[in-house]
Design a protein with these regions (language model features):
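Conserved N-terminal beta-strand and adjoining loop/helix that marks the start
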Residues: 1-16
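Glycine-centered flexibility motif
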Residues: 5-7, 25, 54-55, 61
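Short, hydrophobic/aromatic-rich beta-strand segments within well-structured domains
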Residues: 17-18, 72
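A short gly/proline-enriched turn/hairpin at secondary-structure junctions
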Residues: 27-31
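Unchanged
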Residues: 33-127
């Protein structure tokens, strides 16, 4: 099972984090879940490993992407147009996005499905 992180700004609407994988291009942070690891734990771990960011897992949805979980994570750091470096050697850069970047490993339809998802219908992880 894998997890995808929908990391959004708690300060500004419409901003989310993507990472630029050296071989695949721009994608949402995420990866394989460890044995016994809950989706929200895996999401927070992957977000930190790939983007160097900490956040609060708010909700989870297992129907958005086939074979995986999407975890909504709120991040309370300033939104900036400037990219930053990742601690993960496979990640070229990290940045806040307002639209799906060119050279995206994800199809625009997949991202739009997540952008437009009504998280109130998902499993809440508390406040």
């Amino acid at each position: 099972m894998f997890v995808v992180v929908w990391a959004v700004s708690s300060r500004e609407d419409g901003c989310w984090i993507m990472v630029k994988n050296r071989s695949r291009g721009w994608e949402l942070p995420g990866g394989r879940m460890g044995q016994g690891e809950a989706p929200e734990e895996a999401a927070l771990r992957e977000l930190f490993e790939e983007a160097g960011a900490l956040g609060t897992a708010k909700a989870i949805d297992s129907d958005l992407i086939e074979g995986g979980h999407v975890v909504l994570v709120e991040i309370d750091i300033p939104v900036s147009p400037d990219p930053w470096k990742s601690m993960d050697d496979s990640i070229e850069e990290v940045g806040w996005c307002l639209q799906v970047p060119e050279n995206s490993a994800w199809g625009g339809e997949e991202i739009e499905r997540i952008i437009n998802h009504d998280w109130s219908t998902s499993i809440s992880l508390g406040s």
